Structures are given as C-alpha cells and as structure tokens.
From Swiss-Prot:
Official protein name in the record: Outer membrane protein P1
Span of the signal peptide: 1-22
Keyword Ubl conjugation: no
GO MF annotation, one: long-chain fatty acid transporting porin activity
Record SUPFAM superfamilies: Porins
C-alpha cells in the first residue's frame, strides 16, 4: 500500500480547527455592506437583501423585491515560526531503543487567498409577509504547507467549506414588531492531506528498523510505508455531506430612526462517511473500512441596534455569542464499532463586539466605518492548520446608487491578530512497546486584508 492514513475521517475536522478571519473556522463575511462597518448592527440593519443571512425578521422592512450578489476576497497572511522534534521508541525484551530527529516548524504564508461568495433575494408578499432565499459561506478555511514540511502531521493541506442555502419568511406582528424564521441546508466539503515529516526520518534509524522487524503488523513495515517526509499519512479527498438547521429572528422598531434586532442560528450536525478510511491507531492500514464522523457547526446568537441620529448620520452595534463549547471532542469509529479517533478540542464559547457608523454624504453616496473585536474560540487548544487568535477589525465601506434601483457596495477591512505561542503533540502507538511522537513549538501571528464588492438591484 502506498499510503497509510491516520484517522482519516476524524482528523479531517480536527486539523481544520482554526480560522484566519473569525473565531475558529467561522466566517463573518456574508455581505460587502456589512464588511464596511465591521459587521456592526447585522441583526438590525436592512441595507439590502443580505438580511436573509443575518436576521430574517428584517425582510418585513422591504417595500419592493430586491436582489444582491457579490463576495469578499480574503487575503490572509499567517506566518508560523518554531521547531519540531520527532522520535521513534521501541521496547523489546525490556530493552529500549530511541531515535530522535529535530527540524524546523517554520513556514510563511500558510493560508492562500480565498473568495467568499454570496447571493440573496427578498420578495415582499404583502404589507405583513415577506419571503427570502440566499446562499452564503459562514464556515470554512484553507491552509497549505510544503509537502516536505518537517511537522507534516500538523501542517499539510486543509480545505473545508460549508455552503449555506437558506429559505426564510418574515411576518410583521404589529407596526413595530416583526418575526422571522428560516431553514438552512448546509453542503460541506472537506479535503485534508497530512504528511509524515520527521516521523519518516526517525523510523529509518538502523536500530529502530531492526526492532520493528520483530513487531506485528502494521508496525513491522513502517519504514516501507514511510519512505520520505512527503509521504501522506492522512488523506481525505473532497468528501461531501449535507446538514440541516434553522434560524430565527425578531426585530422591534421603536420608530423610523431606532430599532433593535435579535437573531439566532441553530447548530448543524454534518455526518461524514468514508468507505476507504484507515487508522494507524486502530491498526487498519492495508485496507480501508467504512468510517463515520458527526461534526457539529455551532449555534450562535446576535443582538444588534441601529440608531439614525441625524438625517445623515447613523450608528450601529452588535454583540455576537457563538456556542463553540458544543465541540468538546471529535470521535470517529468504524462500522464494527472500533474507535478510529478520539480527540479533546477544549473549545470555549466566544464573543464578538462591533461598533460602526454610516453617513449619507449625499443622495447617491453612503459611507461606512466600523471596528470590531473578535475573541478566539480555541484559547486552550490551538492548531497549526490555522491557529486561532483574538483579532481586531478596522473597516471602511461605501454604497453608490447609480439609479434608484441599482447600487454597488464596496468594502475593505484590515484584521490584526495577536501573536500566540502554542505546542502541538501527536503520539502514536501503545507506549509499552512502540511509540511514535512528534512535538512542535509554534509562534504565530496573523493579519488579513479583506476586499468586498456587491451589486444590489431593487425591482
């Protein structure tokens, strides 16, 4: 067999436990108008049809049908600095043999650029009822390390996307109170590659190779399975699955100039299945078996306010709370019940606060600005795949109306993340006879530039 895969299915999600632009792997980039104000006021502002993705109750404010489409390009810069040590240890006849290899865990720009698209439509049915539909990406990440990366079991390639399809309705209960409800279908795809790195060098030691020959399969032929650093030890190619959830919102408008909104998005369970899953830890290397993993996208709650202070100036704010502690651990098993993988995540619930302002310079041009602070979710367990960190947003944006029906949104944001130090450790084997261990010490710092463009049309 050309490659063995260590907990293919579960590791796919484990190694995707990080994010460059929002806590863990949650994305905030649902619209360009929101980008320009650091997504302050999302549950209370009805700039355009993107309310489908934020608070469906806001659809009751629309007098005519509206279409909005566009996206945000994320140009991330994440640099990793550190060192890695790998060792293979075998104990036979009470005699221990150990081979230790040291290397570099440093690499620059581990996150490539990515485009986050969106598409929305809102249609009022009558004075009280409105319908809406939309497509956006609210969870996702991508990171890439060199194939020969010394800490290959932690780096490699990770590509996770969760496309959310939404159908919503809004009902105006009273002149000031509106309610909204929606259903979500999430199409998720995952691609993961992890390489042996220094593990391959440690098992090539002559004493270790000799001692391995006395072991049972699959460990006896480890040298053959791991001929080089770039040998794949985890491979999950474009596995896809569907998950379903719901969202709800309430909006209360005190008057034309003041309103508040509250929106909730439920958790979404996604069941991945891999009929070629293998696991070194479960001694399944030479032939794959069907493996199963249920992964949860967390629920979140957002409270927002909008206040038109003058004819030209408005302020808006948001508090967003995401229930990341639902992800306590990742567990994958084979059809026969044998454990393939079990990993504690230690995620913490996180908060995001944002403050923004809009200014109508003249009839055709609206300017925006905002600032936000986004708390990390993986404060107790960080990952080299994309290390999570607290980050601050600085945003600017504008909307220009070419005609009463056609407008364009432009937005820019600079995200600055805190410098973080963390360690990753991976141990394979029973620790009584054979142990393969890799330990990496990291220092990372991230920043990103975000560019948004949306086209809006009112019918």
């Amino acid at each position: 067999m050309k490659k063995f895969n260590q907990s293919l299915l579960a590791t796919a999600m484990l190694l995707a436990a990080g994010g460059a632009n929002a806590a863990a792997f949650q994305l905030a980039e649902v619209s360009t108008s929101g980008l320009g104000r650091a997504y302050a006021g999302e549950a209370a502002i009805a700039d355009n049809a993107s309310v489908v993705a934020t608070n469906p109750a806001l659809m009751s404010l629309f007098k005519t049908a509206q279409f909005s489409t566009g996206g945000v390009y994320i140009d991330s810069r994440i640099n990793m600095n550190g060192d890695v040590t790998s060792y293979a240890q075998i104990i036979t006849n009470q005699i221990g043999m150990k081979a230790i290899k040291d290397g570099s865990a440093s690499q620059r720009n581990v996150v490539p650029g990515a485009f986050v698209p969106n598409l929305y439509f809102v249609a009022p049915v009558n004075d009280k009822f409105a319908l809406g539909a939309g497509m956006n990406v609210n969870f996702g990440l991508k990171s890439e390390y060199d194939d020969s990366y010394d800490a290959g079991v932690f780096g490699g390639k990770t590509d996770l996307s969760a496309i959310n399809l939404n159908l919503s309705g809004a009902y105006r209960v009273t002149e000031g109170l509106s309610l909204g409800l929606g259903v979500n279908a999430v199409y998720a795809k995952a691609q993961v590659e992890r390489n042996a790195g220094l593990i391959a060098d440690s098992v090539k030691d002559n004493q270790i190779t000799s001692a391995l020959s006395t072991q049972q399969e699959p460990f006896r032929d480890l040298k053959k399975y791991l001929p080089s650093k770039d040998k794949s030890v985890v491979s999950l190619q474009d596995r896809a699955a569907w998950g379903f959830g719901w969202n709800a919102g309430v909006m209360y408008q005190f008057n034309e100039a003041n309103r508040i909104g509250l929106a909730y998005h439920s958790k979404v369970d996604i069941d991945f299945a891999d009929r070629t899953a293998t696991s070194l830890e479960a001694n399944v290397i030479k032939e794959g078996k069907k493996g199963n993993l249920t992964f949860t996208l967390p629920d979140y709650l957002e409270l927002s306010g909008f206040h038109q202070l003058t004819d030209k100036l408005a302020v808006h704010y948001s508090y967003k709370y995401t229930h990341w502690s639902r992800l306590t651990k990742l567990h994958a098993s084979f059809e026969d019940g044998k454990k393939a993988f079990d990993k504690e995540l230690q995620y913490s619930n996180n908060s995001r606060v944002a403050l923004g302002a809009s200014y109508n310079l003249y009839e055709k041009l609206t300017l925006r600005a905002g600032i936000a602070y986004d708390q990390a979710a993986s404060r107790h367990h960080r990952s080299a795949a994309i290390p999570d960190t607290d980050r601050t947003w600085y945003s600017l944006g504008a909307t220009y109306k070419f005609t009463p029906n056609l407008s364009v949104d432009l937005g820019y944001a600079y995200l600055k993340g805190k410098k973080v130090h963390f360690k990753e450790v991976k141990t394979i084997g029973d620790k009584r006879t054979l142990t393969l261990n890799t330990t990496a010490n990291y220092t990372s710092q991230a920043h990103a530039n975000l560019y948004g463009l949306n086209l809006n049309y009112s019918f």
